[in-house]
Amino acid sequence: MVNNRNEIEVRKLEHIFLCSYCNVEYEKTTLLEDIELIHKGTCGINFNDIETEIELFGKKLSAPIIVSGMTGGHSKAKEINKNIAKAVEELGLGMGVGSQRAAIVNDELIDTYSIVRDYTNNLVIGNLGAVNFIVDDWDEEIIDKAIEMIDADAIAIHFNPLQEIIQPEGDLNFKNLYKLKEIISNYKKSYKNIPFIAKQVGEGFSKEDALILKDIGFDAIDVQGSGGTSWAKVEIYRVKEEEIKRLAEKFANWGIPTAASIFEVKSVYDGIVIGSGGIRGGLDIAKCIAIGCDCCSVALPILKASLKGWEEVVKVLESYIKELKIAMFLVGAENIEELKKTSYIVKGTLKEWISQRLK
């Protein structure tokens, strides 16, 4: 367990640098390429009438897009969160912040997260680690501190066993996660009835996971499947110990691909599902919505854009929205509810996955 506050801050900066400038993406794909939306040549709608708006966690979004929680806890992270907040305010989208543990243990870092509320009144999602409720004995007061820090509309609890076991300073005790059931229930009764999101960090959730998360009481699941950023790959660049590098290389492609994770979760869970992990454009978003997601979250492309300024973040997100609307036009969907009902086929590896796991 990390006890040194500065060590957490340094790790935050290392993660920003490595994700921005090194090849940290999976070699395998999200399997979204195995989904084909059925083209409607007689689409029968006016492109200019297409509406992408949704309501999520009590907030209206102009499109089903959230910038995933990525960072905080360092002065550079403060600038990134500022740029993202300005961009989502401009476009009417939502955002999350990175793990707030750094500010939980060091109040001096709170402003690297709270700055988002200086620039956006839109949906903001907090972020805490599931493992810390076990190893650090966190309780409802920690959740309330994280929520108050950024006036959060929802709170994500991230599950990252692979990242923890590869990190030299990782926490390895994920036993007794059902402790979260009592904590979430107590928080909603004693503090605020706020939505709780179970969030992966790149390895996806299985149907078995989804059943556990449902029983614990999570209102939403952010699948964050494999095919995007590999945190094992990040550690290959970060750590100096050769044995840890070797292990990170072995598990660099571990995880459930995003599309497969969505099907897994949707097979047993009827709450809100967020598609994420390697989302690289509006067509990916359209596919996720078509197979059952309520919205999508995007991370790495936005992190890279944010280093160039908030205007660059706007450009990337605008391109995603434009691509989403084109996909909707081509399947004849005037709004997101109609997109959820659009026809598609599943082929290749994803079809095989579904036949073995879900039939």
Curated annotation (Swiss-Prot):
Q: Which residues bind Mg(2+)?
A: 164
Q: Record keywords: Lipid biosynthesis included?
A: no
Q: Which SUPFAM superfamilies match?
A: FMN-linked oxidoreductases (SSF51395)
Q: Does the keyword Flavoprotein apply?
A: yes
E.C. number, please?
5.3.3.2
- Record's subcellular location: Cytoplasm
* Example GO BP: isoprenoid biosynthetic process
Per UniProt, activity regulation is: Inhibited by 3,4-epoxy-3-methylbutyl diphosphate (EIPP).
| UniProt keywords, alphabetically | Cytoplasm, Flavoprotein, FMN, Isomerase, Isoprene biosynthesis, Magnesium, Metal-binding, NADP
Positions bound to FMN: 68-71, 99, 127, 199, 229, 278-280, 299-300
Function in brief? Involved in the biosynthesis of isoprenoids. Catalyzes the 1,3-allylic rearrangement of the homoallylic substrate isopentenyl (IPP) to its allylic isomer, dimethylallyl diphosphate (DMAPP).
Family to which this protein belongs: Belongs to the IPP isomerase type 2 family.
Q: Which HAMAP family match?
A: Idi_2 (MF_00354)
Record-given protein name? Isopentenyl-diphosphate delta-isomerase
Q: Which organism is it from?
A: Methanocaldococcus jannaschii (strain ATCC 43067 / DSM 2661 / JAL-1 / JCM 10045 / NBRC 100440) (Methanococcus jannaschii)
